[in-house]
Amino acid sequence: MKVNLDRTSSGFCIGVQGTIHLAEEKLREHDGKLYCLGDIVHNEVEVKRLEELGLITIDLNEYSALTNAPVLIRAHGEPPSTYTTAKSNQLDVTDSTCPVVAKLQRSARMLHNRGYQIIIYGKKNHPEVIGINGQCDNQAIIIKHPDLSAPEETAPLDFTRRTALISQTTMDVPGFAMLKENLERLFSASAGPGERHAASHWQDIRDIDLTAEITGVRPLPKFLYKDTICRQVSSRNSKLHDFAAQNDVVIFVAGKKSSNGQVLFNICKASNPRTYFAEDEKDIQDEWLLENRQPVQSAGVCGATSTPMWLLEKVARSIESRFSS
């Protein structure tokens, strides 16, 4: 059996990689004691490794009660209230918010402050979405289903307001496009005769367009969208699809809490039905890698943006050792 490890489209994205490096650095600085608000990464194996080095994962209630202590803000980002608490509690904060997420937060805040109704394509309880919504005074409308199949998600929409569609950085590009088209139809159907054209053709904007509005050079359109999906993440979709197709069996390694992991696993599964989900090498069942009681010719090992490369390598070595004979 040949074991193929995907090193180009799997493993930590830049944002998570930066957070992990900062955590290790701060743990050394603070003699092996550092608090992190929420799981530093949605991978239980990596969290356990860092906790063994001294990282202490805390929830919001524990964070609010903490004083004069070093705290790490993870790559997902946080709402403004988290920083207010840090200041009042004299916390030594290391902010490792992903630059892509930080840019998205600024866009959301600017559009909200200009009076826009903000729609976020994302998952309501995902920490990144909570942070983005916080930039909008927690007034954003969050839609997970691009086909608008959940009426409770669209019920709060005000069809008379200026409206902006943005996205959680790890959502899928086709879903974002579908949501935009469905919102165009929905707003057009609800608009008056004079508004139907604008409502049915939402405009794509760039950062320069936001600056033009703020400086008074030209106004933003009433209905707009800004594709804020991280391309480093989304570009993995097609690459992992191809990788999965090139192997007899695929072992996809990720944490069960990983939103990105679920998306990428489903992409691999669609490309190769013999794709199996594992958190680590202990989850792998021998029968996954057999065909007519013989080892398959090739097994691919890949993972999510929250899966460390050391874990992927460990899984690959485990498969090789189990089927080396």
Swiss-Prot record:
Keywords: 4Fe-4S, Iron, Iron-sulfur, Isoprene biosynthesis, Metal-binding, Oxidoreductase
Residues where isopentenyl diphosphate binds: 42, 76, 126, 258-260, 306
Residue ranges that the Swiss-Prot or TrEMBL entry lists as coiled coil: none
Gene3D superfamilies: 3.40.50.11270, 4-hydroxy-3-methylbut-2-enyl diphosphate reductase, catalytic domain
CDD domains: lytB_ispH
Highest rank taxon of the organism: Bacteria
Enzyme type, top EC level: oxidoreductase
Pathway: Isoprenoid biosynthesis; dimethylallyl diphosphate biosynthesis; dimethylallyl diphosphate from (2E)-4-hydroxy-3-methylbutenyl diphosphate: step 1/1; Isoprenoid biosynthesis; isopentenyl diphosphate biosynthesis via DXP pathway; isopentenyl diphosphate from 1-deoxy-D-xylulose 5-phosphate: step 6/6
Binding site for dimethylallyl diphosphate: 42, 76, 126, 258-260, 306
Cofactor note as given: Binds 1 [4Fe-4S] cluster per subunit.
Catalytic activity field: isopentenyl diphosphate + 2 oxidized [2Fe-2S]-[ferredoxin] + H2O = (2E)-4-hydroxy-3-methylbut-2-enyl diphosphate + 2 reduced [2Fe-2S]-[ferredoxin] + 2 H(+); dimethylallyl diphosphate + 2 oxidized [2Fe-2S]-[ferredoxin] + H2O = (2E)-4-hydroxy-3-methylbut-2-enyl diphosphate + 2 reduced [2Fe-2S]-[ferredoxin] + 2 H(+)
GO molecular function: 4 iron, 4 sulfur cluster binding; 4-hydroxy-3-methylbut-2-enyl diphosphate reductase activity; metal ion binding
Active site residues according to the UniProt entry: 128
Signal peptide: none
InterPro entries linked: LytB/IspH
Keyword Glycoprotein: no
Keyword 4Fe-4S: yes
Residues that bind (2E)-4-hydroxy-3-methylbut-2-enyl diphosphate: 42, 76, 126, 169, 258-260, 306
Enzyme Commission number, as recorded: 1.17.7.4
Cofactor: [4Fe-4S] cluster
Binding positions ([4Fe-4S] cluster): 13, 98, 230
Gene Ontology terms: biological process: dimethylallyl diphosphate biosynthetic process; isopentenyl diphosphate biosynthetic process, methylerythritol 4-phosphate pathway; terpenoid biosynthetic process
Role summary: Catalyzes the conversion of 1-hydroxy-2-methyl-2-(E)-butenyl 4-diphosphate (HMBPP) into a mixture of isopentenyl diphosphate (IPP) and dimethylallyl diphosphate (DMAPP). Acts in the terminal step of the DOXP/MEP pathway for isoprenoid precursor biosynthesis.
Stated family: Belongs to the IspH family.
Name under which the protein is recorded: 4-hydroxy-3-methylbut-2-enyl diphosphate reductase
